């Protein structure tokens, strides 16, 4: 049976339309995709290889006197793997003080294309619904979860490097 016919069979008092039924199915599929360790591994690998550190000045803070110590990072982007610990820590401080927006992420379109080839099997109406769920799973669930992991990992690494530099300087 086609997708619409199948969705019609789920219409109830709570699920009042085909679109509601399809959205419910997509939400369930998005959760399955989010919990798939292979999918999460692919996203993690893309973060490891291609994540960019991106900072922007927080809205309304461009002219703030206190924010000027972070002005180098008002519009900054560089590969996470190349970002020195002192710079990463400065950006994080700018975020904590409310002057910067700080994100770590690879190119969304690249990841979504890789995931599409991995997850979508076929070219029909059902595959189209899975593709919509996949995009939602990445944008709403997976991306922020993996970014949170990489924020923590990069912070721990930067803290460790900063301590090593401090100890080295004490010994000199």
Regions found by a protein language model. Name each.
Residues 1-172:
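Duplex nucleic acid-engaging cores and interfaces of nucleic-acid transaction enzymes
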């Amino acid at each position: 049976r086609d997708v619409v016919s199948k969705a019609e069979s789920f219409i109830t008092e709570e699920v009042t339309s085909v679109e509601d039924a399809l959205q419910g199915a997509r939400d369930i599929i998005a959760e399955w995709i989010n919990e798939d360790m292979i999918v999460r591994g692919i996203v993690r690998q893309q973060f490891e290889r291609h994540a960019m550190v991106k900072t922007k000045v927080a809205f309304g803070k461009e002219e703030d006197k206190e924010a000027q110590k972070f002005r180098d990072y008002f519009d900054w982007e560089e590969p996470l793997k190349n970002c020195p610990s002192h710079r990463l820590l400065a950006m994080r401080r700018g975020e904590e003080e409310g002057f910067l927006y700080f994100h770590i992420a690879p190119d969304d379109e690249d990841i979504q294309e890789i995931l599409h080839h991995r997850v979508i099997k076929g070219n029909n109406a059902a595959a189209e619904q899975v593709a919509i769920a996949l995009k939602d799973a990445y944008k709403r669930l997976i991306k922020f979860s993996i970014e949170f992991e990489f924020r923590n990992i990069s912070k721990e690494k930067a803290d460790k490097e900063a301590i090593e530099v401090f100890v080295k300087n004490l010994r000199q």
